[in-house]
Amino acid sequence: METIAKHRYARTSAQKARLVADLIRGKKVSAALEILTFTNKKAAALVKKVLESAIANAEHNDGADVDDLKVAKIFVDEGPSMKRVMPRAKGRADRILKRTSHITVVVSDR
């Protein structure tokens, strides 16, 4: 049984979150949680929270055994970018893009 959890509009770029997602794809959830706990990146904390949510969803909604679960799929899509302005010299301004991403984790007992 596949169970999904999503974090939409996560305040990290998709490029940075994908580096973390690649670390846990296909692993058992217990191993994935350990990896994320000791990964020193901001995106690791965000991905860990989504993974914990997926595990809780599987246990509560589908009655799955946590020991059998593995990360079947994990992907990170780009969300909308927030446009901001940074003042520069001589009255100019630069545009800053604050990027967001959508993190999706699918856990399965198969």
Curated annotation (Swiss-Prot):
Keywords for this protein: Ribonucleoprotein, Ribosomal protein, RNA-binding, rRNA-binding
Is this entry keyworded Ribosomal protein? Answer: yes
Q: Which GO terms describe its molecular function?
A: rRNA binding; structural constituent of ribosome
Output the Pfam families linked to this UniProt entry: Ribosomal_L22
Whether Isomerase counts among this entry's keywords is no
NCBIfam families in UniProt:
rplV_bact
Query: Which protein, by its recorded name, is this?
Result: Large ribosomal subunit protein uL22
Query: Could you tell me which species this protein originates from?
Result: Glaesserella parasuis serovar 5 (strain SH0165)
Gene name in the database record: rplV
